[in-house]
Swiss-Prot record:
Pfam families: AAA_lid_4 (PF17864), RuvB_C (PF05491), RuvB_N (PF05496). Residues 4-186 are annotated as: Large ATPase domain (RuvB-L). GO terms for biological process: DNA recombination; DNA repair. It is an enzyme of class 3 (hydrolase). Homohexamer. Forms an RuvA(8)-RuvB(12)-Holliday junction (HJ) complex. HJ DNA is sandwiched between 2 RuvA tetramers; dsDNA enters through RuvA and exits via RuvB. An RuvB hexamer assembles on each DNA strand where it exits the tetramer. Each RuvB hexamer is contacted by two RuvA subunits (via domain III) on 2 adjacent RuvB subunits; this complex drives branch migration. In the full resolvosome a probable DNA-RuvA(4)-RuvB(12)-RuvC(2) complex forms which resolves the HJ. CDD domains: AAA (cd00009). GO terms for molecular function: ATP binding; ATP hydrolysis activity; four-way junction DNA binding; four-way junction helicase activity. Belongs to the RuvB family. Residues 260-337 are annotated as: Head domain (RuvB-H). DNA binds at R296, R315, R320. This is Holliday junction branch migration complex subunit RuvB.
Amino acid sequence: MIEADRLIHPQIIDREEAEAVDRAMRPKMLDEYTGQDDTRAQLKIFIEAAQKRGEALDHMLIYGPPGLGKTTLAMIVANEMGVNIKSTSGPVLEKAGDLAALLTNLEPNDVLFIDEIHRLSPVVEEILYPAMEDYQLDIMIGEGPAARSIKLDLPPFTLVGATTRAGALTSPLRARFGIPLRLEFYNVKDLSSIVARSAKVMALEIDDEGAVEIARRSRGTPRIANRLLRRVRDFAEVKHSGDVTKVIAEAALDMLDVDAEGFDYMDRKLLLAIIDKFMGGPVGLDNLAAAIGEERETIEDVLEPFLIQQGFIQRTPRGRIATPRAYNHFNIIKPDA
């Protein structure tokens, strides 16, 4: 697994960090939400239409790399609809009764948010199908020959599922989501706006160039941008006057070993393994995972997406290949084929 202290890990490092983001930095309404313009425009229409009809919003699947705002969007949906949200995650729902307890406590049009929905157990998933389609819950009462099935009516509700691995969902579950939304990595302009907004919430003075520098090294991910902003603030308060400029942001992030592309030692280790150990590739995922001491799922879900999106790695049928841009990043001359 990825080391817990990896600063640019796009997943939540600890629950305290998540709660701090929840309280202060997360936008509450769509108008406050920055980036993902197409997704935001679609959601605005879907929400307004559901409100006009007085109905629950259709079930929604939000997918994409970690740290892009899937949980935030689920909360915004509940706020925009003026309803409550109950949150859980796939691994937590071990038994059918766990899901039944949540569903039977929903009010009309409430939002049920299930993070990591691709990790639902088959038993729980089977219970979810009639709940999503017919707002009914099929549960078994008793055991053995005396066991019987009863149907409970549920109020209309919106299931919002979030996943980093949409392909891991079963086809029957995926087909029951009427609104699929894919979140993309953020551009520097949108990320710098997020950094500036977060700095304002933190009562931190930051100039435009400082915000851009943090955004540029945040791997297109708001969660990483906010995490780096907090560490840059620490540096600015101890080493300087407390205000953040480009020079201060550069010094702080260099000290934290986050380079100009947003890479840390794990990214560099991955790229250099392909270049040095496997002569630029192609290399299979299992061999690459063994070479850098990581799990293949970590490489696929956390390390690779940004490197591929930025053009440092290519996936081919034969394996991963380091691109010319990867060689240039390390000032290595690519040997002739």
